[in-house]
Curated annotation (Swiss-Prot):
Source organism (scientific name): Schizosaccharomyces pombe (strain 972 / ATCC 24843) (Fission yeast)
Lumenal topological domain residue ranges: 1-74, 121-170, 217-233, 281-293, 409-411
Transmembrane segments: 75-95, 100-120, 171-191, 196-216, 234-254, 260-280, 294-314, 388-408
Family: Belongs to the type 2 lipid phosphate phosphatase family.
Gene Ontology biological process terms in this record: phospholipid dephosphorylation; sphingolipid biosynthetic process
Signal peptide: none
Protein name listed in UniProt: Dihydrosphingosine 1-phosphate phosphatase C823.11
């Protein structure tokens, strides 16, 4: 389902998304389209929340809570999970890490689809004060809250797992971990309102979406685990086909939004993980948790050091390789219409997070350029292909290459 839009440029002075004149969205979606009608139905509800949200923020605000909620919000970001999840995987928590990674990717993808479909704004600022350590608020729509979706999905899945293990844990450990999970869920979801980043509808919809994803993942956990341990050739084929389908299916936003780029990145990571676990030998994966001994902490430190360096080297190598290879290939195949800019190199640097230049939008996963504003949007252009290669490579290296090295080095 590709949602086409007319080529409507947004003013350069426009800072936040979703607040254009109604004619902008009627031209982009079509005045009689279901998409436009639903947006017009929900928008007044979102706008009416502002006054109450401002009263709540004004009543509770103090410097300590400002710092607390701004920093705890980083626990629901892409950067935190991109750093934490490989480390959990290399520590031997294989299936839990794969479950959480898949949940996080699903949360980013489905919340991004809804955001880009409805193109609804965040709470008005002013009067709301937006408290954030990131500038991403300028480049994302508000409905629903991706932070809340991810917190609810990963938090509730962790709760389900914790409850299933309650009989085998001490009371102190159980209630300590339970408190941490509940604190995490509450801090992220309530913090979105306190920080002025989202309204009640954003958070409540994110909650419903996140809990639904957690229940689905928990119910079909055994199925996914069997897929990751399967040797059937249908696994890598279906993984690639589904990844490309989900990227194609993602709605086209009315304005330049980073949701599509984030979705492409995480769908690609999952594809890389599926391929990596399929190619990986059972010995290399079992070694991750069978190597628990008195030297485990030292060996684990070496694993993390090697793994982080591996990812950094891969990103650097992939960028340079793509800069050298992709543009000539596209030109030789006469696929210049897939190049969103006349200077393909700049576009590839942007897609792979290589540099920041005027006109680019910085994100936690890289930078985007005019990919979205191409007169005739093409989903699989050079920028998209570059992003798929880079991030699927990260997933593949973390689940295949790194465990293979750890086994060979006996660490």
């Amino acid at each position: 389902m590709v949602h086409k839009k007319k080529n409507v440029d947004i003013p350069s002075s426009q800072k936040y998304l979703g607040i254009q004149h109604v004619n902008f969205y009627s031209n982009a979606f079509g005045k009689e389209s279901l998409r436009f009608q639903l947006r017009e139905l929900i928008l007044p509800i979102v706008r009416k929340e502002t006054r109450l949200l401002y009263k709540i923020q004004s009543f509770f605000r103090n410097p300590w809570l400002d710092v607390y909620f701004m920093y705890t919000a980083t626990l629901g970001t892409h950067v935190f999970f991109m750093l934490a999840l490989p480390i959990f995987f290399w520590s031997g928590c294989i299936y839990y890490t794969l479950d959480i990674t898949q949940l996080f990717a699903a949360g980013v993808y489905f919340s991004g689809c809804i955001k880009d479909y409805f193109c609804l704004p965040r709470p008005r600022s002013p009067p709301m004060v937006r408290l954030t350590l990131s500038s991403d608020a300028e480049y994302e729509y508000g409905f629903p809250s991706t932070h809340t979706t991810n917190a609810m999905a990963t938090g509730f899945y962790s709760l389900f797992l914790l409850l299933s293990m309650s009989d085998s844990m001490s009371s102190i450990s159980y209630y300590f971990l339970l408190s941490l999970v509940l604190l995490y869920i509450a801090s992220i979801s309530l913090g979105r309102i306190y920080c002025g980043m989202h309204g009640f509808m954003d958070v409540s919809t994110g909650t419903i979406l996140g809990v639904t994803l957690a229940i689905f993942q928990w119910k079909y956990a055994d199925f996914f685990h069997n897929v990751w341990s399967s040797s059937s050739t249908s696994v890598p084929i279906l993984s690639v086909v589904l990844a490309l389908f989900f990227i194609w299916f993602h709605p086209q936003p009315a304005e330049r939004c980073i949701c599509l780029e984030d979705s492409i990145s995480f769908i690609s990571v999952i594809m890389g993980i599926d391929l990596g676990t399929w190619f990986a030998s059972p010995e290399s994966l079992s070694h991750l948790h069978d190597n628990l001994n008195s030297y485990f902490l030292l060996k684990f430190f070496v694993r993390v050091l090697f793994g982080v360096c591996m990812i950094l080297i891969w990103k650097s190598f992939a960028k340079q390789a793509l800069l050298a290879v992709l543009p000539p290939i596209f030109k030789s195949l006469r696929l210049s219409y897939l190049e969103p800019k006349s200077q393909s190199e700049k576009g590839i640097r942007a897609a792979t997070g290589s540099n920041h230049s005027p006109g680019n939008i910085g994100t936690e996963l890289g930078v985007i350029t005019s990919h979205q504003s191409h007169p005739h949007p093409v989903r699989f252009d050079i920028e998209t292909i570059a992003r798929i290669i880079v991030y699927s490579g990260i997933g593949f290296l973390c689940t295949y290459f790194a465990p293979k090295v750890f086994l060979k080095w006996k660490i």
